[in-house]
Amino acid sequence: TTPSVVQITKDEVKIGNAAKRAMVTNPKNTISFVKRLMGADFNDENVKKMQKLATYDIVNKSGKPYVKIDDKEYSPEQISSMIVGKMKKVAEDYVGEEIKDAVITVPAWFGDTARTATKTAGELAGLNVLRVINEPTSAALAANLMEDKKDKTVVVVDSGTGTVDVSVLELSDGMAEVLASNGDVYLGGKDYDDAIVKWVVDEFKKSDDVDLTKDNMAYARVVESAEKAKIELSSSSQTEINLPYISMKDGALLNLAMTLSRAKFESLVKNLNDRTVEKAKVAVEKAGKKYDDIDCILLVGGTTRIPSLQEALKKEFNKPLNQSVNPDEAVALGAAKQADILAGNSTGDLLLLDVTPLSLGI
């Protein structure tokens, strides 16, 4: 997958993994989580929170949040269009022809202004946006949950790098209605990484009396190793974190070598799992549904690979977890299926009606 990260310097623009790798050495020029600014007003509470957390400057331009890099100001749509443009090129390189049309997905809680801003980003990237659809609906389409046209109630838990979105869908005869949506734009895979980072930093401080947060390059290596450790612990009972020559003390080079067990990791992230489950519980309540009404829980986003999160969801809802589609690809695959239908290429007769009721409060 390609991280939604952009780094802008006077010499070049880096997008995706290249920007993510360069983030620690030049955080001021590196933009991430711009999705949180889409369609927002500068005085929104969410923007105020982003100003405190972002490594880059967010400024007021005509009542809207803009990203300021050096002496230039960029709208969220412009930054987002750079990411969309990169993906357009990746797709064109793969299929060997120009791509003009696209279906773009958004979180179910996105309001009209955020949806319009997303469509604008696609257009700035040179695309004709055929439709903007809800991410949980797209995931349900990818998982073939709508093909039999039977009535179903599905809870979609989408946990990505920086956000958790839980939606309750009612599927009926090719129609998908979002009954309720609930989430946290400040909870996701990065928080699981951060839990490991904190543990590593604390343990090293105890053993070697060196604070790795004071050294940007050392800290960047810890952050990178934490993400790898998290991924490995989804399939292994323990993992090794080895960072040779991580620091220096009294003229001697120091090595970092630690073993992190899955059990220890689970204890570090229990509160994150609990918060995600709570978001799902509230979504079901808002939808006016009982647990017995739920047919399955569809897992979307890389963070849902974490075994302890899966167990927490199973324990709470006692419902089957649908993992039939790669969680990193589910939303994109559903969008591709919808695009195929709209282009008239699909042999199926599914016409997706994606409904977001006003009762969602967006």
Labelled PLM ranges:
Residues 1-63, 68-82, 89-362:
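Oxyanion-binding/catalytic loops of NTP- or PPi-dependent enzymes
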